[in-house]
Amino acid sequence: MRRALVPLLAAAAVLAAAAPAYAAIPAHVKWKSSGAFAAWNNGGFIVYNNEWNHSAGPQTIWADSYRHWGVESTQQAGNTAVETYPCVQKNYDNPPVSSIRLLRNGFAESMPGNARGLDAEAADDVWLNNYNIEVMIWVDNHGQRPSGNVIGHATIFGQRFAVWHGGTDYTFALDHNETTGMTHIQASLRWLISHGYIPASATLTQVNFGWEIASTNSKAEDFKLTGYWLHTQRS
């Protein structure tokens, strides 16, 4: 679960204390912070250092834009519980999902390639009904297991997913890893509605893309987003 999600912030919102310079972080960036829950508004999006778990280790976020940003994160070796979810975030005014004709995004991301002990995944995190229903779409998984149990399999625009359900959470776990690609969020929501898992009256609250990080084997590791777009078309 990803808690303590930031609301839509004014342009002068959180700028926590800047982190010291690390070799892995670009020398000249527009914004950088090591503050938990630090956030930066850019282009109608929020780049968010979401260290939501109280036991999270240190994490420095940097950004040139909502399309190009990253984190250097150090999380305890052997940990399997998610500690942080640094992400790019878009807030919505709770339109009915049924009123959205198209909702999809494109991404280009990278995680530590050969890091031993890495436990993390890249994923969309979609919140419905004022944060009461959570739908995730995992695209690049290294060691994580969704909560709950498999309730079915979905083929969405040629991509095959195992669909998991636990509590009020749903996860579409891609059957292979992709570091660049596109996720069809609206089609995933329609699958859940058509199978009776979420109500047809569900509303869209928030869309995020980032990494759920549980462990970096107690080493500072780099996660980078080098391309991102989100397209929403209402009926």
Which role does the model predict for each range below?
Residues W138-H142, G166, E212:
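Active-site-proximal beta-strand/loop segments in catalytic clefts of secreted hydrolases
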Residues T179-S235:
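Long, compositionally biased interface segments
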Residues A24-E72, R234-S235:
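N-terminal segment immediately downstream of the Sec signal-peptide cleavage site
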Residues M1-A23:
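Secretory targeting and sorting signals
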Residues W69-S73, L103-S110, D124, T205-A214:
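Short, hydrophobic/proline-enriched secondary-structure or compact coil segments at domain edges
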Residues G158:
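Conserved, mostly hydrophobic/aromatic
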Residues W164-A187:
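Short, surface-exposed, low-complexity cationic segments
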Residues Q76-T155:
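Extracellular-facing segments of soluble proteins and assemblies that are Gly/Ser/Thr-biased and enriched
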